[in-house]
């Protein structure tokens, strides 16, 4: 048997003693949300044995369970519900149980996710690691719940904007990435804006790179993301609070050539740019 980790398991202990039975009771009271152990006789051999089930408070390795009970017991991961195991282990009429059978299924899975979020460990990445099945099934609901109970504060700082323009191959993109890497906490803290309306994948990264830009972000939105006031960017199915500290924009053309609409004037845009460089 592999030494895997388990939270819910059933066990059989052949030819037990009363001390063994008492040890099972102590284990259940100390480590289980719900547990039951019953005395039985095998129908064909009349071998006395204990039939038990445990729903642990915390996952435990098979080797640890055997160390705390007995190395000779047979352990299996339980596939049935707590109530099914309760029925099975109590059929002889002589049994011990402690705690309440836990409800299984979606509601219990989601409650575990809620507990994690309320404990302050509720980033989407931590939920994905700790509760992968619930994350896959209920990603959208989990995301919205986190936004509701732990809203992201709006931006009230001026986002620093750097605009690098020049001919292809002059090193604009490389310089932007090098500078962003130096300022970001890690590579996951850098967001590359895809072309178009959507900001999918934006999660308040401190650094945003808008590479090879030639006017494909609407001018009014460009002015807003480069400013200091609260603003939400659009993702598919919702919005994200824009809070980034730095924006790099690279382009083959100067700011006065970015937009083609009548009466376009780049004064408001240039006023929001802290560093503007021609790289040749």
Curated annotation (Swiss-Prot):
Belongs to the nanoviruses/circoviruses replication-associated protein family. InterPro entries: CRESS_DNA_REP (IPR049912), Helicase_SF3_ssDNA/RNA_vir (IPR000605), P-loop_NTPase (IPR027417). A motif (RCR-1) lies at residues 10-13. A motif (RCR-2) lies at residues 49-51. It comes from Human associated cyclovirus 1 (isolate Homo sapiens/Pakistan/PK5510/2007) (HuCyV-1). It comes from the Viruses. Its EC number is 2.7.7.-, 3.1.21.-, 3.6.1.-. The keyword DNA-binding applies. GO terms for biological process: DNA replication. Essential for the replication of viral ssDNA. The closed circular ssDNA genome is first converted to a superhelical dsDNA. Rep and/or Rep' binds a specific hairpin at the genome origin of replication. Introduces an endonucleolytic nick within the conserved sequence 5'-AGTATTAC-3' in the intergenic region of the genome, thereby initiating the rolling circle replication (RCR). Following cleavage, binds covalently to the 5'-phosphate of DNA as a tyrosyl ester. The cleavage gives rise to a free 3'-OH that serves as a primer for the cellular DNA polymerase. The active site is at residue 88. SUPFAM superfamilies: P-loop containing nucleoside triphosphate hydrolases. ATP binds at residues 166-173. A motif (RCR-3) lies at residues 88-91. Keywords: ATP-binding, Covalent protein-DNA linkage, DNA replication, DNA-binding, Endonuclease, Helicase, Host nucleus, Hydrolase, Metal-binding, Multifunctional enzyme, Nuclease, Nucleotide-binding, Nucleotidyltransferase, Transferase. GO terms for molecular function: ATP binding; ATP hydrolysis activity; DNA binding; endonuclease activity; metal ion binding; nucleotidyltransferase activity; RNA binding; RNA helicase activity. The lineage of its organism: Viruses, Monodnaviria, Shotokuvirae, Cressdnaviricota, Arfiviricetes. Divalent metal cations, possibly Mg(2+) or Mn(2+). There are 3 rolling circle replication (RCR) motifs. RCR-2 is probably involved in metal coordination. RCR-3 is required for phosphodiester bond cleavage for initiation of RCR. This is Replication-associated protein.
